[in-house]
C-alpha cells in the first residue's frame, strides 16, 4: 500500500508520491535533519524479503553512492525500515525525456537537443564504467532534465545501483525487461552473458534512436518478438524512419552491432560520432581503440544464477516469438491470397472509404482528398488491431480494437507492465470479479489483472478476454 502524504518512513516525511513501478514507489520526502527534499525510493516488501537481493541492493547502492558526477543523480543514503529497503536520492525538479517526446516531440526531438542529451549521459556512463559500475537500464525514462526551459538546465542519469539486475533471483527484473527495458537492452544482457560498458553503449544508442525518431529501434506488441530482433535482426536504418537522418545510418549500425567488439568502445565515442553527423563537433571516423572497462565479475554462484535464470526466461519468450512469427507469416500469406476481398468499400451519403488491411508498421501520413459531390477519402490505418489487456509498448503508442475503438498503451497501476487499454491514463486496478474456471489452474496476479481489465473495459467474458490476450501475446 502506498505511503500516505504526511506520514513518516525511516525518519523521512512523505510529501507526495512521484511515481510507482513493479519494484516499489518513489516519493518526494523531507529529509529528517537537513532542510531539503529528496527522492525516496521504497522497494516492495516481497522484493526486500529476498536475502540475496538485499545484499546485492546494499552493495550496489553503496557503489552508486560513491559516484559524484554532474550528470548523475546522486545517491545519499540507503537502509531498511519495516521490512522494506529504501534508497535516498537527489530530487530532480523537472521532467524526463519520455515526457518530452510525448508532450513536445512525438515524431522525434531536434538533432542538437539529442546530441546535448546523449553527450551528457555518455560522459556519465563512462565515468561510472571507469569505476567498474554498470547502469544496465539506460532508457528515456531514466534521463531526467532539471529546469528544462532554463538556460542552466541539467541533464542527469537516474537509477544507478538499483536498476537492471540481470541475475535477479526473484524474477522481478526479468519480468520488467519483457515489457519495458527490453526495447533498449543489449543482446548479451538479454542472454545473461558477462557485461561491460558496451552493453550500456548499446542501450544509449537505442535511446538516441528513440529520441531522434519517436520510437525505439525494434517495435512489436509482443516483447518476445523484440527480444528476437535484438538477438538476430540487423540494426534498422534510421534513415528509413526519418530520411534526413540517413547520414546517421553507419553510426547506428556500429553502435547497435550484435557483438560488443563491433561497437564503439566508449559511450563518448558514440556521442562524438553522433554529434558530428548531426552537425556538431566530433570525428565521424574516430577509431581510437579504447579498451572497455571490464566490470568485476560477481561470485560464481551469481554467475550460475544468471546462466540459469535469464536464458530460462528468454527461452520461454523465444518460443512465444517463434509462435508469433509463424502466425504473422501465415497471416501475411492469407492476406496476399485474399487481397481483393480484404479491401472493402462502403458508401454512405456519397462518401466512399477504402480501408486497407491493418499493418504493424508506421505508414506515411495520409491526407484525405475531397472531390466535390462524390467526396472520396482514402486512408491507411496507422495502428494494428490489438486486444485490450494484452502486452504492448512503447508506452503512449496507440492501436485499434476489433470494434474500431482507439486503444492506448498504458501502464497498469502499481506495476511496470504496459497493456492495451481504452483509457489513455494509467490503468486503474480492475474491480470486476470473475468466476474461477474449474478446468484452469489459478493464474498469478500479473496475468489475472490484465484479463480483468479486459472484462471491465469491454464487457467480454473472462474466457473471451483470456483467449484474446493469449493469442495477442503469442502464448501457447
From Swiss-Prot:
Single GO BP term: regulation of primary metabolic process
Catalytic activities: L-seryl-[protein] + ATP = O-phospho-L-seryl-[protein] + ADP + H(+); L-threonyl-[protein] + ATP = O-phospho-L-threonyl-[protein] + ADP + H(+)
Highest rank taxon of the organism: Bacteria
Protein name in UniProt: Serine/threonine-protein kinase PknF
Gene name as annotated: pknF
Residues recorded with modification Phosphoserine: 290
Binding locations of ATP: 18-26, 41
Family membership noted in the UniProt record: Belongs to the protein kinase superfamily. Ser/Thr protein kinase family.
Amino acid at each position: 500500500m502506498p505511503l500516505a502524504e504526511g506520514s513518516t518512513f525511516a525518519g523521512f516525511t512523505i510529501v507526495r508520491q512521484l511515481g510507482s513501478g513493479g519494484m516499489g514507489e518513489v516519493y518526494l520526502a523531507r529529509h529528517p535533519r537537513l532542510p531539503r527534499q529528496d527522492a525516496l525510493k521504497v522497494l516492495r516488501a516481497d522484493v526486500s524479503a529476498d536475502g540475496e537481493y538485499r545484499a546485492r541492493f546494499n552493495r550496489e547502492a553503496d557503489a552508486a553512492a560513491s559516484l559524484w558526477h554532474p550528470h548523475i543523480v546522486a545517491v545519499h543514503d540507503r537502509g531498511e525500515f519495516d521490512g522494506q529497503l529504501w534508497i535516498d536520492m537527489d530530487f530532480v525538479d523537472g521532467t524526463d525525456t519520455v515526457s518530452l517526446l510525448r508532450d513536445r516531440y512525438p515524431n522525434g526531438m531536434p538533432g542538437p537537443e539529442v546530441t546535448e542529451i546523449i553527450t551528457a549521459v555518455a560522459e556519465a556512463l563512462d565515468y561510472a564504467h571507469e569505476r567498474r559500475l554498470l547502469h544496465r537500464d539506460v532508457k528515456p525514462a531514466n534521463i531526467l532534465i532539471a529546469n528544462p526551459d532554463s538556460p542552466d538546465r541539467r541533464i542527469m542519469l537516474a537509477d544507478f545501483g538499483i536498476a537492471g539486475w540481470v541475475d535477479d533471483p526473484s524474477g522481478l527484473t526479468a519480468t520488467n525487461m519483457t515489457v519495458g527495458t527490453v526495447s533498449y537492452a543489449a543482446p548479451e544482457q538479454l542472454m545473461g552473458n558477462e557485461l561491460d560498458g558496451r552493453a550500456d553503449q548499446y542501450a544509449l544508442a537505442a535511446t538516441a534512436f528513440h529520441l531522434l525518431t519517436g520510437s525505439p529501434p525494434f517495435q512489436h506488441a509482443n516483447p518476445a518478438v523484440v527480444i528476437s530482433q535484438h538477438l538476430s535482426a540487423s540494426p534498422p536504418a534510421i534513415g528509413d524512419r526519418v530520411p534526413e537522418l540517413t547520414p546517421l545510418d553507419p553510426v547506428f549500425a556500429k553502435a547497435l552491432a550484435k557483438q560488443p567488439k563491433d561497437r564503439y568502445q566508449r559511450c563518448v565515442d558514440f556521442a562524438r560520432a553522433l554529434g558530428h553527423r548531426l552537425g556538431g563537433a566530433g570525428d565521424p571516423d574516430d577509431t581510437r581503440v579504447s579498451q572497455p572497462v571490464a566490470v568485476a565479475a560477481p561470485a560464481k554462484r551469481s554467475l550460475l544464477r544468471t546462466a540459469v535464470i535469464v536464458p530460462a526466461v528468454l527461452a520461454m519468450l523465444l518460443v512465444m516469438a517463434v509462435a508469433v512469427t509463424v502466425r504473422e507469416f501465415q497471416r501475411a500469406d492469407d492476406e496476399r491470397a485474399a487481397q481483393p476481398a480484404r479491401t472493402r468499400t462502403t458508401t454512405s451519403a456519397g462518401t466512399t472509404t477504402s480501408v486497407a488491411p491493418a499493418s504493424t508498421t508506421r505508414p506515411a501520413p495520409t491526407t484525405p482528398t475531397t472531390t466535390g459531390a462524390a467526396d472520396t477519402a482514402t486512408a491507411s490505418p496507422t495502428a494494428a488491431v490489438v486486444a485490450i489487456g494484452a502486452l504492448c509498448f512503447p508506452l503512449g503508442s496507440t492501436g485499434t480494437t476489433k470494434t474500431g475503438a482507439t486503444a492506448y498503451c498504458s501502464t497498469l497501476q502499481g506495476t511496470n507492465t504496459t497493456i492495451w487499454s481504452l483509457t489513455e491514463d494509467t490503468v486503474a486496478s480492475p474491480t470486476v470479479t470473475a468466476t474461477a474456471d474449474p478446468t484452469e489452474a489459478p493464474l498469478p496476479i500479473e496475468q489475472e489483472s490484465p484479463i480483468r481489465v479486459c472484462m471491465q473495459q469491454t464487457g467480454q467474458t473472462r474466457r473471451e478476454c483470456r483467449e484474446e490476450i493469449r493469442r495477442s501475446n503469442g502464448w501457447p
